[in-house]
Amino acid sequence: MIEILHEYWKPLLWTDGYRFTGVAITLWLLILSVVIGGVLALFLAIGRVSSNKYIQFPIWLFTYIFRGTPLYVQLLVFYSGMYTLEIVKGTEFLNAFFRSGLNCTVLALTLNTCAYTTEIFAGAIRSVPHGEIEAARAYGFSTFKMYRCIILPSALRIALPAYSNEVILMLHSTALAFTATVPDLLKIARDINAATYQPFTAFGIAAVLYLIISYVLISLFRRAEKRWLQHVKPSSTH
């Protein structure tokens, strides 16, 4: 194990000398997909709870498709399937975009987490106490101001525990990136195994690194929950 760590610590953590690899790419995939997917989900969640069926139905269909199919299949569709379409091959931008395994992986991860996060945020919006909404209306808040000042802040606090689980699941999902030849942590572990024939050591090191990242993320979310959810915890009685 010491020999493997000594020889492969750089590609495991951040670079093989030519490109970013390992933990660096895994974190990059996670951050991009969670940030872009989270921002999109915030707007889609508002539409998801809309009473207008022409707004609500397309969003429901989107979340149904991406939550109802495996992420692995979605990645294969984007990476292997899209490039076979004539419209993709005939359009310069689409041709360049879907030829990149990294682009396809980010797209699949982003849309997948966006679908799940949309439902998390929509459920949180529905859980905002009705009294808060009525009070905002009584003060003459516009719909935009009511969402900005009352509904979304409350909904995001409510959604935080479930959303933290989604982020951890997305970290685990980045391990599928090797399918699109992206040199993430698992891809480097597979390469180490192929070079050394020591699968227990190669994948064991990867597992430890995933655990460390998970621990850091869980700790950050626990700090956030203590800060923003302290007021909703029941007070202790003696």
Curated annotation (Swiss-Prot):
Output the Gene Ontology terms for molecular function.
Answer: transmembrane transporter activity
Quote a single Gene Ontology cellular component term: membrane
> Which is a GO BP term held by this UniProt record?
amino acid transport
The record's InterPro entries line, in alphabetical order, gives: AA_ABC_Transporter_Permease, AA_ABC_transptr_permease_3TM, MetI-like, MetI-like_sf
For this UniProt entry, what is the primary localization, expressed as one broad class?
Answer: membrane
- Enumerate the transmembrane spans: 27-47, 59-79, 105-125, 158-178, 200-220
Q: Mind telling me which Gene3D superfamilies this protein's record contains?
A: MetI-like (1.10.3720.10)
Question: What SUPFAM superfamilies does the record point to?
Answer: MetI-like (SSF161098)
Residue ranges in the Periplasmic topological domain are: 1-26, 80-104, 179-199
Intervals, Cytoplasmic compartment = 48-58, 126-157, 221-238
Q: Keywords of this protein's UniProt record, alphabetized? A: Amino-acid transport, Cell inner membrane, Cell membrane, Membrane, Transmembrane, Transmembrane helix, Transport
The residues covered by the ABC transmembrane type-1 domain are 23-221
**Which PANTHER family does this chain map to?**
ABC TRANSPORTER PERMEASE, HISTIDINE TRANSPORT SYSTEM PERMEASE PROTEIN HISM
Quaternary structure, from the entry:
The HisPMQJ complex is composed of two ATP-binding proteins (HisP), two transmembrane proteins (HisM and HisQ) and a solute-binding protein (HisJ). The HisPMQ-ArgT complex is composed of two ATP-binding proteins (HisP), two transmembrane proteins (HisM and HisQ) and a solute-binding protein (ArgT).
What NCBIfam families does the annotation carry?
Answer: HEQRo_perm_3TM, PRK15069.1
Full protein name: Histidine/lysine/arginine/ornithine transport system permease protein HisM
Native species of this protein?
Answer: Escherichia coli (strain K12)
